[in-house]
């Protein structure tokens, strides 16, 4: 196991690393000053760029957010990664609305899946949604996600951030 290997060779690594308490390593000023590129994983991301890092179906805790909040808010570049699908390809990890929000569109610079990279900087919500669908969603779910977005745009009175909550909540059931 790699952990055992690390500790067996600790002297080899001793002069190459510095261990600090979380109050220092996760301090916003330290993160900003170093120009950190933060890469965090998510359970799901929505088409607008909000991410869920901690809850399955919005209610079952998978893991905590840890230091991801500190890093994504203060990093020079904040990247989130996920697979495009779960449950052997039957469930999209790119959804109309995440079931729980850990990180918002205001903190995320890029989203990456095995399908591609969506650089979200400077884009409005509809531009972000189209880019995430086209670059990050699995091809088998892209049509349904575009249909959701088109319907939300045509029915939502707030065109700058079109959301159809009922359709978003039913998205997984429809798959």
Name each model feature, range by range.
Residues 1-175:
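Conserved phosphate- and dinucleotide-binding cores of soluble alpha/beta proteins
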